Amino acid sequence: MIKECPGARLHLTIVPSQSQASTVTRVELERGGQRQTLAPPPEMADYTAVGLGCAQDKTGTDYFVVQYGELPYGCEFCEWFFLYDTQGRLLNHATPPLREQDHQQSPNNDEYEGKLEELGLKHPELMPFQP
């Protein structure tokens, strides 16, 4: 899957594996003809990239959003969002990944939401990955 963003292109692909159906993906950032792999957040070791989006602040600075979850079926309460700058640097974390309130689990996107507010960004419309 390819997501076109201003000045860049994001690639989301399945990582080949020995098993028949791989559920691991890789995200690459392409700028100026060069590709670099975006490092997944360490806390997402048990999850994989499932969506891509583009965001731009009021000054025109571009950012990229990668959504993490599970493939191929998704999961009940896992939609984490991570913000990257144009150099491919991860700008937020989700530590711990899950929070529990009133015996209900939900994804911890607090730092992501704080970064959006700090940078004056709106959560973008995300393109979901369809394996």
Predicted ranges, named:
Residues 24, 47-51, 63-64, 75-80:
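Short, surface-exposed coil-to-beta transition loops
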Residues 26-43, 80-96:
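Surface-exposed loop/turn elements that mediate protein-protein interactions on large endomembrane-trafficking
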Residues 53-62, 85-91:
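A short, structured loop/turn motif at beta-sheet edges
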Residues 18-21, 33:
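Beta-strand-enriched, solvent-exposed domains that form extended recognition/catalytic surfaces
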Residues 42-50, 104:
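Repeat-based blade/solenoid architectures
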Residues 11, 57-69:
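Acidic/hydrophobic-patterned starts of short beta strands in beta-sheet-rich repeat architectures
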Residues 1-7, 52-59:
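Structural signature of eukaryotic scaffold interfaces centered on beta-propeller domains
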Residues 1-9, 15-19, 71-131:
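Acidic, small-residue rich beta-repeat scaffolds with periodic aromatic anchors
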